């Protein structure tokens, strides 16, 4: 099991946890909209670090983005396995062809 899979399992386990005992549980308790807002904030921070060119800071912010993506997905009951299956479905397809195939 990869670190991303372990993190996704931890996020899923926190769905029923006491919001006072877990940051993840607190985010999930605040609903999908708050989870999406936090994801957006972290994405912007990653973009800023990408522009600045600080590799270590970008890696740190990218880790935050991945965590908050998993929380946002969990808030809408979308699993990492579903996302991975979609990536596998797209694998080997050019981006132009994949986008055209969406309709």
UniProtKB/Swiss-Prot annotation:
Its main location: cytoplasm. It is an enzyme of class 3 (hydrolase). Its EC number is 3.6.1.31. Keywords: Amino-acid biosynthesis, ATP-binding, Cytoplasm, Histidine biosynthesis, Hydrolase, Nucleotide-binding. It is found in: Cytoplasm. GO terms for cellular component: cytoplasm. Belongs to the PRA-PH family. Gene3D superfamilies: MazG-like. It comes from Cereibacter sphaeroides (strain ATCC 17025 / ATH 2.4.3) (Rhodobacter sphaeroides). InterPro entries: HisE, PRib-ATP_PPHydrolase-like. SUPFAM superfamilies: all-alpha NTP pyrophosphatases. GO terms for molecular function: ATP binding; phosphoribosyl-ATP diphosphatase activity. The lineage of its organism: Bacteria, Pseudomonadati, Pseudomonadota, Alphaproteobacteria, Rhodobacterales. Pfam families: PRA-PH. The gene is hisE. The keyword Nucleotide-binding applies. This is Phosphoribosyl-ATP pyrophosphatase. It catalyses: 1-(5-phospho-beta-D-ribosyl)-ATP + H2O = 1-(5-phospho-beta-D-ribosyl)-5'-AMP + diphosphate + H(+). Pathway: Amino-acid biosynthesis; L-histidine biosynthesis; L-histidine from 5-phospho-alpha-D-ribose 1-diphosphate: step 2/9. One of its GO terms (biological process) is L-histidine biosynthetic process. PANTHER family: HISTIDINE BIOSYNTHESIS BIFUNCTIONAL PROTEIN, HISTIDINE BIOSYNTHESIS BIFUNCTIONAL PROTEIN HIS7.
